[in-house]
């Protein structure tokens, strides 16, 4: 059976034509599946009965199975999604007064082996399918539906409640979950196309961000195919240190990466690149390195996002103390570089940045099923 979640509009047009249907049927399917979240063809009332029968014989709408659901004290919510054979990936929803951000995974594990990342320690299993990527957004909108009044400030909630197109709680998507998005290029781009489609999720390119550790050729392809907002995991101002923290730097050093960023900017929906910099105590948080970083990025329109490290067992790293982070930020700000310190969210449920390990083989053997049919961890 063909999973319709694997298709963007172009793919659905081809699928419909193969069944002898007109191209406009693809738009109808997109709206039923993604905007209205329907999985049963019998409910798609504006489709001809003969077409619905064909669909029931050949296709399914099958999002990945949810195996656990956790909510942190700050409202951050994390779900584990089964990918079969005891593996799982994670998606995280971060509510804020004026927006709701979904952090999406693109791979089971990651091959890039960044030394400070728990997912990198897991190793690489496989790429996620389009259905498994877009299924995260599909699920989030379904599971959070009706909670707009609780998730947003009163004025924003009222505006969104009055507009059918903005009732969905996810306003922003960041490809910052498990995996390197650009290492799963085709599936990620197809999923991005669905996120941006007015017939599916209708997000603007400014509200969708792809984060990369620096796969330069794929970054150039993204610029040509689907230039959404870009975040680059930099983490060091020189190759010697970045080689240790982000091993892909040995293949695509900082000079090549920054050149790719400059090429990306003319097509980007924002007039800057975001550079991410995890703050590791006594590793990359000195004033000298801050000054070196200023020299490295000063000619690129950018923002710096300093990320306090979230420790995990066996990491070998510690979070920089508050004074070190503040002093590092001040050096950048004094040089005219817009710099923010990321607020740690969801760390009490291991949902914070860098903690998405997804090692749940023991949990998948201990799942039960709730009344809605979704599996939940029982122990």
Curated annotation (Swiss-Prot):
Record note on cofactor: Binds 1 [4Fe-4S] cluster. The cluster is coordinated with 3 cysteines and an exchangeable S-adenosyl-L-methionine.
Domain Radical SAM core stretches: 96-348
EC code(s) of this entry: 2.1.1.192
Main location: cytoplasm
InterPro entries linked: Aldolase_TIM, Methyltransferase_A, RlmN_N, RNA_MTrfase_RlmN, rRNA_lsu_MTrfase_RlmN/Cfr, rSAM
Disulfide topology: 103-353
Presence of the UniProt keyword tRNA processing in the record: yes
GO biological process, one term: rRNA base methylation
Subcellular localization, as worded in the UniProt entry: Cytoplasm
Cofactor dependency: [4Fe-4S] cluster
Entry-linked CDD domains: Radical_SAM
Catalyses which reaction(s): adenosine(2503) in 23S rRNA + 2 reduced [2Fe-2S]-[ferredoxin] + 2 S-adenosyl-L-methionine = 2-methyladenosine(2503) in 23S rRNA + 5'-deoxyadenosine + L-methionine + 2 oxidized [2Fe-2S]-[ferredoxin] + S-adenosyl-L-homocysteine; adenosine(37) in tRNA + 2 reduced [2Fe-2S]-[ferredoxin] + 2 S-adenosyl-L-methionine = 2-methyladenosine(37) in tRNA + 5'-deoxyadenosine + L-methionine + 2 oxidized [2Fe-2S]-[ferredoxin] + S-adenosyl-L-homocysteine
Positions bound to S-adenosyl-L-methionine: 179-180, 211, 233-235, 310
Organism domain of life: Bacteria
Active site, per annotation: 90, 353
Keywords: 4Fe-4S, Cytoplasm, Disulfide bond, Iron, Iron-sulfur, Metal-binding, Methyltransferase, rRNA processing, S-adenosyl-L-methionine, Transferase, tRNA processing
Note: Reaction proceeds by a ping-pong mechanism involving intermediate methylation of a conserved cysteine residue.
Job description of the protein: Specifically methylates position 2 of adenine 2503 in 23S rRNA and position 2 of adenine 37 in tRNAs. m2A2503 modification seems to play a crucial role in the proofreading step occurring at the peptidyl transferase center and thus would serve to optimize ribosomal fidelity.
Similarity comment text for this entry: Belongs to the radical SAM superfamily. RlmN family.
Protein name: Dual-specificity RNA methyltransferase RlmN
Lineage of origin: Bacteria, Pseudomonadati, Pseudomonadota, Betaproteobacteria, Nitrosomonadales
Gene that this sequence comes from: rlmN
């Amino acid at each position: 059976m063909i999973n319709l979640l694997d298709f963007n509009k172009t793919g659905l047009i081809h699928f419909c034509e193969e069944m002898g249907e007109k191209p406009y049927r693809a738009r109808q399917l997109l709206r039923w599946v993604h905007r209205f979240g329907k999985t049963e063809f019998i409910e798609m009332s504006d489709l001809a009965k003969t077409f619905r029968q064909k669909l029931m014989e050949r296709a399914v709408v099958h999002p990945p199975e949810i195996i656990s659901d956790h909510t942190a004290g700050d409202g951050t919510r994390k779900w584990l999604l089964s990918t079969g054979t005891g593996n799982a990936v994670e998606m995280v929803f971060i509510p804020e007064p004026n927006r709701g951000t979904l952090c999406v995974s693109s791979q089971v594990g990651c091959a890039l082996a960044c030394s400070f990342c728990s997912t990198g320690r897991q190793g690489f299993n496989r790429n996620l399918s389009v259905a498994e990527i877009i299924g995260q957004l599909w699920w989030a909108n379904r599971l959070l539906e009706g909670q707009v009044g609780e998730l947003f400030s009163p004025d924003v909630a009222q505006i969104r409640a009055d507009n059918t197109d903005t009732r969905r709680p996810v306003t922003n998507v960041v490809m910052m979950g498990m995996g390197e998005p650009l290492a799963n290029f085709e599936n990620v781009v197809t999923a991005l196309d669905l996120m941006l489609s007015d017939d599916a999720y209708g997000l603007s390119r400014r509200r969708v961000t792809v984060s990369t550790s620096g796969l330069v050729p794929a970054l150039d392809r993204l610029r040509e195919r689907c230039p959404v907002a870009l975040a680059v995991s930099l983490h060091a101002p020189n190759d010697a240190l970045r080689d240790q923290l982000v091993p892909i730097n040995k293949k695509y050093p900082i000079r090549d990466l920054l050149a790719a960023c400059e090429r990306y900017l003319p097509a980007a929906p924002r007039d800057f690149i975001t550079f991410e910099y995890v703050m590791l105590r006594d590793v990359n948080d000195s004033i000298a390195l801050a000054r070196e970083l200023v020299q490295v990025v000063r000619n690129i329109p950018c923002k710096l996002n300093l990320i306090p490290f979230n420790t995990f067992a066996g990491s070998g790293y510690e979070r920089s103390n508050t004074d070190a982070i503040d002093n590092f930020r001040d050096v950048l700000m004094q040089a005219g570089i817009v710099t923010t310190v990321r607020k740690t969210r969801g760390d009490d449920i291991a949902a914070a940045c860098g903690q998405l390990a997804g090692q749940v083989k023991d949990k998948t053997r201990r799942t039960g099923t709730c009344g809605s049919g979704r599996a939940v961890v029982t122990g």
